[in-house]
């Protein structure tokens, strides 16, 4: 773990960073991708996503059922945790944790919390502002103390100093954007079930046979008020590099738009896109709508990789009206009639027909192909949603001779942005129409 500072020293030190160069968007056509291998600490992978919610039991079960992610571990009253209830659902390398507080009046010991950074008062403020939302994007790093100290030394705002969970696991957090934290976890041995303090969920209660083919988190997208300061802040303390860039001219519609930058780690398997709204369009940007309903910056959507998007979508759509997730409206038939001209022969006629039947969007870049689809918002507010994707192509061989897929293969759906915007705009119009009708009736 290396030499550690005291918690007071770490939390008070936020300083020796120099101001980065002024951020400026150049647009998709002028952007030149390069990987400077500039990470300031060793990042292994996305480890988990933590949601804060009012009811962890039922929210975790909905995501489990809707996404095909068995409930595998828990930390709650039954395990001795009197501070919060947390439930872990998992599919292959994708882990979601759902956390809700117990009453502080019944808490016997704050030391019983499995996630030591959890705060009941912080939760209540978070939930009142954001509703169901992502609290933490967790990265597995080689060394938590080194990652935290390197981040804070370069300007990261500390949220929770390094804590030793047991003699072989550590956790720390820094602020990312809004009320979202970037969590660092590391293990001195092979990781067990999850974090210390979690116990396995056995038997039929775990839905052990659920598997719709979802395998990992591809990217976690944040919406922010202003892109430049946030990009500079995150790049500054992580060392992550710009992987892709889009402006309103690249991806907007006649009615609304956004600017977007994707940040990536050295291996380009941890991808953090960031969006800002644009102004002066006919309609309010959907990014601005998000910021208003979320009361500030936050995670807009999570892109989940499927090994077979057709199977995943068939299973998810079966459950859309049975407690699962609904999807954004499908593109018009003309979208699929023109698909072969846009993406070539990478998909057969039968696969294109299946894309149309399931409402899947398809795009490609000079390296590979992307299949994608978006759910409607997963909670009461028009904020957080899920994207299901499959990337095709870009296969490489590692030093051990094993094949792997290059990160971000097929891009981020530049060719589908306008189609997605239209579908979101149509969805928002239905909400606005109801609000106008309700106001008139009142």
Swiss-Prot record:
It is found in: Cytoplasm. Fe cation binds at residues 219, 301, 387. GO terms for cellular component: cytoplasm. Keywords: Cytoplasm, Dioxygenase, Iron, Metal-binding, Oxidoreductase, Phenylalanine catabolism, Repeat, Tyrosine catabolism. GO terms for biological process: L-phenylalanine catabolic process; tyrosine catabolic process. One of its GO terms (molecular function) is metal ion binding. It is an enzyme of class 1 (oxidoreductase). Binds 1 Fe cation per subunit. It catalyses: 3-(4-hydroxyphenyl)pyruvate + O2 = homogentisate + CO2. Disulfide bonds: none annotated. PANTHER family: 4-HYDROXYPHENYLPYRUVATE DIOXYGENASE. This is 4-hydroxyphenylpyruvate dioxygenase.
């Amino acid at each position: 773990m290396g030499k550690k500072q005291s918690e007071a020293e770490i939390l008070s030190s936020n300083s020796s960073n120099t101001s980065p160069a002024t951020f400026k968007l150049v647009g998709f056509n002028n952007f030149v991708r390069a990987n400077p291998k500039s990470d300031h600490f060793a990042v292994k992978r996305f480890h988990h996503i933590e949601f804060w919610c009012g009811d962890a039991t039922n929210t975790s079960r909905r995501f489990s059922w809707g996404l095909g992610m068995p409930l595998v571990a828990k930390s709650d009253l039954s395990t001795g945790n009197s501070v919060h209830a947390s439930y872990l659902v998992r599919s292959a390398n994708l882990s979601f944790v759902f956390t809700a507080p117990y009453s502080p009046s019944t808490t016997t010991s704050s030391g019983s919390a499995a996630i030591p950074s959890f705060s009941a008062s912080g939760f209540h403020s978070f939930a009142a502002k954001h509703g169901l939302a992502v609290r933490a994007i967790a990265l597995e790093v080689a060394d938590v103390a080194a990652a935290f100290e390197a981040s804070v030394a370069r300007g990261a705002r500390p949220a929770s100093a390094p804590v030793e969970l047991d003699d072989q696991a550590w956790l720390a957090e820094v602020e990312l954007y809004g009320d979202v934290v970037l969590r660092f976890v590391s293990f001195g041995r092979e990781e067990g079930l999850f974090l210390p303090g979690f116990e396995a969920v056995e038997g039929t209660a775990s839905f052990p046979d659920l598997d719709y083919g979802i395998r990992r988190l591809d990217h976690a997208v944040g919406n922010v008020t202003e892109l430049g300061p946030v990009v500079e802040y995150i790049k500054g303390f992580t060392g992550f590099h710009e992987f892709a860039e889009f402006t309103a001219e690249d991806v907007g519609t006649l009615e609304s738009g956004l600017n977007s930058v994707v940040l990536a780690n050295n291996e380009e398997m941890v991808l953090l896109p960031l969006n800002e709204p644009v102004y002066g369009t006919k309609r309010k940007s959907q990014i601005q709508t998000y910021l208003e309903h979320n009361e500030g910056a936050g995670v807009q959507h999570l892109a989940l990789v499927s090994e077979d998007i057709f199977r995943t979508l068939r299973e998810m759509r079966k459950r859309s009206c049975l407690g699962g997730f609904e999807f954004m409206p499908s593109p018009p038939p003309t979208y699929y009639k023109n698909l072969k001209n846009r993406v070539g022969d990478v998909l057969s006629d039968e696969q294109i027909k299946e894309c149309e039947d399931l409402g899947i969007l398809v795009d490609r870049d000079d390296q590979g192909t992307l299949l994608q689809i978006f759910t409607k918002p997963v909670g009461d507010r028009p904020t957080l949603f899920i994207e299901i994707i499959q990337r095709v192509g870009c296969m490489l061989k590692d030093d051990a001779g094993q094949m792997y897929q290059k990160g971000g293969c097929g891009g981020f759906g530049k060719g589908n942005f306008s189609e997605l915007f239209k579908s979101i705009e149509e969805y928002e119009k239905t909400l606005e129409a109801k609000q106008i009708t309700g106001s008139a009736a009142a």
